[in-house]
Amino acid sequence: MSDFEPFYNVDLSYEDNYARGPFGEFAAALRGDVPAGEAASPAKSSFLGIPVDLPFGIPAGPLLNERFTTAAFRMGFDIATYKTVRSRAWGCNPFPNVLAVHPTSADGSLTPGSAELDEGVLADADYRLPISISNSFGVPSRDPDEWQPDMRRAIAAAGPGKKEYAEQNVSKEMEQTMEAQP
């Protein structure tokens, strides 16, 4: 790899990432070594009816807990999705569970109708930049007694436009999660 250090360390287990991450620039953002992403002007876009500066974010997969979402917000992402949770603790699939994905095209894209879509894409542990990954965590979850307070801290750390969406939707999502799973 290069000097670039991803915020999720693929050489560590999910549990180690949860306990020790995030890494790289995201860790620097948590320490305050990187200026917080602040809105300099009114929001320019919206996402699900909530004003945001840029409707671009990070999906739930690698944002394991409040430290990861807070770092994402501080790095300037307006949409940081907290890792999917369950109504009870659930372990992660065995390590290794992240692979680098290498489409054959020079720009890394997949073309509709290409043989690669039928035959498959090379996936291995060769993490070259630019990097694309695929994971199979298995929807792990901490016990609700742990993740619910952590999620509240994540919401509290969100800034304008980010916090409003979370406050409007998280309580409803927590209720649905608790009702949907045994």
Regions found by a protein language model. Name each.
Residues 1-59:
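N-terminal basic, low-complexity leaders that serve as flexible interaction/assembly modules and, when applicable
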Residues 46-51, 55, 61, 84, ...:
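Residue-level preference for alpha-helix termini and adjacent loops
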Residues 8-9, 13-14, 18-22, 27, ...:
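Active-site entrance/lid segments in N-terminal catalytic domains of soluble metabolic enzymes
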Residues 60-66:
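Short beta->alpha connector loops
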